[in-house]
Each structure stands twice: as C-alpha cells, then as structure tokens.
Amino acid sequence: MAAARKDAGVLALFDVDGTLTAPRKEVTPEMLEFMKRLRENVTVGVVGGSDLVKISEQLGKSVITDYDYVFSENGLVAHKDGKLIGTQSLKTYLGDDQLKEFINFTLHYIADLDIPIKRGTFIEFRSGMINVSPIGRNCSQEERDDFEKYDKVHNVRPKMVSVLREKFAHLNLTFSIGGQISFDVFPQGWDKTYCLRYLEEFKEIHFFGDKTYKGGNDHEIFESDRTVGHTVTSPNDTVQQCKSIFLSE
C-alpha cells in the first residue's frame, strides 16, 4: 500500500551533520528505520560537505543504496540508485599553482595562530573542495567540543575566512563554515546548490538542514528558489518535521 502512495515528484533532501546525525556521530537505528519509512512516500536524498568515506562512516556502508540520491562533497560527487552519475574536480578547475599558493598561505596562517591546542590534519584536500581546520581534524571529540565553544567566543574561523577571502579574491572562492572545527573552500556555485542540477525532474524539493544561516553550509540551498527550505535543530526535530509534512495522514 505505502509504495503505491509514493509521490515520485517530491524529494526530501537532507543535510547529514546535525540533521540526520549528531555532529560527526553515527546515525541511530531509529533514524535509519524512519528514513526507510519515508522512502515509501517520497524520494529521499542526502547532501553532505564531506566525502563519501566520511558520509559512509556516519550513515553506514550501504548509504548509496539506502537513499535514492547521495551527494557527497556538496554534490560534486553524485550517486543515484547506487550508481555514480557525476564528478567534478577542484584540481582541474584551479590548477596546481593556484592550489599550492592557497595551501601554503593557509598553513602559514595556522602556524602563526595562537589557540589553546593544535593537533594534526589542518588541511584536507578533497576532489571538489578544501577543508581547513585551525585545530586539526584528528582532535578528539572532547577537543572538538572545546574548540567549538572557544570559536564562538573568539571567532577563530570567521576571522580566518575574512583574511583568506580578501587575499584570494581573484580566485572567486566561497568559504563556508560548517561542523564544529572547520570550514570548506570551493569555487563559487560549488555549494550544496550544485546538486540541484541532478534533480530537475522534481516538482517539489524539500531541503532540511541545521546551518541555514548566512555563512552556514546549508544557507545557499535553503535560500534557493528550487527548494522549500526547513531549518532543523537536531535529528529528532528532523523526524518531527518530516512526520508533519509527509506522513501526517
């Protein structure tokens, strides 16, 4: 019965961190079960800033078949029905010389940054973006939580973004603060709206995300004319909103 009611023209599209899972945590069995139920009614997709490996760590190894669409790196790597349907490369787009200039400057900036602790993996190069973390991505969860609180008071990431934006204005880059400890850097237009080019068949796209404010990594897709945007505060809130929108009968 449920499958027959499915509205193929409607897509529910979800951010990962803070929307389907707690930040950098694994999805709960309850959320997986709810998503399965939701898929009986509407088409379901996820779009995350992280690469597919990290999204799989959070949503499970079968993620590309658990959802109709999986967009990693904001959709620069796109899967539909478990199959790869598109990729885009930052290296090809910017070239090695400009990449090296950006990475060198960023590492020098972090080296001179006075913050309580630093760990490792300050820059992570992905196929479609660069992720920059002033504290370093391999800090512990406790250190992540502490840095997030420190950053809210001292604006470490916003200040760093401001410097980089001015220094590299000629590259037309977007800087998007997301998660607890880092920010993403990518060419303008390579934000989460990038995935919408694969979704033209849908008459209604509902997007759910927690960082929908200006500067947050859900902002552009939340504001897009192509989507109906919903701001969520937690995975539980996501479930409640979806129930009232899609499963209210």
From Swiss-Prot:
Expression sites (tissue/organ)? Expressed in roots, leaves, flag leaves and immature spikes.
Main localisation: cytoplasm
* EC number of the protein: 5.4.2.8
Swiss-Prot/TrEMBL cofactor(s):
Mg(2+)
Using the UniProt record, name the top-level EC class of this enzyme in a single word. Answer: isomerase
* Positions annotated to bind Mg(2+) 2: 222, 227
Family per similarity comment: Belongs to the eukaryotic PMM family.
Function noted in UniProt: Catalyzes the interconversion of mannose-6-phosphate to mannose-1-phosphate, the precursor for the synthesis of GDP-mannose. GDP-mannose is an essential sugar nucleotide for the synthesis of D-mannose-containing cell wall polysaccharides (galactomannans and glucomannans), glycolipids, glycoproteins and the antioxidant L-ascorbate. Can complement the yeast temperature-sensitive mutant sec53-6.
Q: What is the protein name given in its UniProt record?
A: Phosphomannomutase
**In which organism is this protein found?**
Triticum aestivum
> Which gene specifies this protein's sequence?
PMM
